[in-house]
Amino acid sequence: MVRRNIELCFPDLTAAEHDALVFRHFEALGMMLIEMGLGRWASDKHLESITKLTGIEHVTNALESGNGVILLSAHFTTLEIMGRVLSLNMPPFDAVFRRNRSEFMTELQRTGRERSAEFTIEKRDIKKMVRSLRKGRAVWYAPDQSYNRKGAEVIAFFGVPAMHTTATSTLARLGNATVVPFFPRRLPDSTYELILMPALQDFPSDDATADTRRYINLLEQHVRTCPEQYFWIHRKFKDLPADYPDYYADLDASK
């Protein structure tokens, strides 16, 4: 799965370079377990000593103006530790989580998010997200994984067709919210950087697909800076319409 996703997204790499990136990704997955522990149990002082936060003013300025804020992120192996760091530097916020087939994994994710966020919201509960935004709160939202329900569109990721939800545009409109993209990464010296970008201007537009493409473009740019830390273990290119390729058919057949 990991190798297939990497091959699709980085076709210009050699086979040896694919192998190296796959290996580095599994190293990042191993580090993720440690980072989850740091996010849950490390002291505030220790976390502040190993992290750098840039752009927090983009969030605080929006909140001070009375707007809700969508903290628009994505699934990186470093995300849980950075959620905790974010919580040390801004007013309490809410975090969206995805219900997993495994109840254990659902609770692991939910309780981990609760270490950072004041409240958690299941990702299908759009009404609850909108209510929170209308109250002038911030909501941490990562809508990059494959989505096959109403409101999904085929939008390329690294040039490969993928199903993406267009809900960010809807949330911003209904919640009258400012959208601030933020992405984390682990640096070569084993410290961490959390980058909060300037609020998206003219967002949402009247084209939810174009809005989503703006987000995907930003995500791709960040992935290129730390490709081993994106969550390649997820089936990013599943659930495409029938007239698109099944990128995992041979993997499924070999099970």
Segments (PLM) and residue ranges:
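Membrane-anchoring hydrophobic helices of lipid-metabolizing enzymes
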Residues: 1-73, 108-111, 117
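Hydrophobic alpha-helical segments typical of transmembrane helices
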Residues: 2-5, 82, 108-109, 125, ...
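Non-catalytic C-terminal accessory region of glycerolipid acyltransferases
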Residues: 19-26, 61-64, 88-91, 123-255
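Catalytic core of membrane glycerolipid acyltransferases/transacylases, capturing the structured
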Residues: 24, 31, 65-124, 135, ...
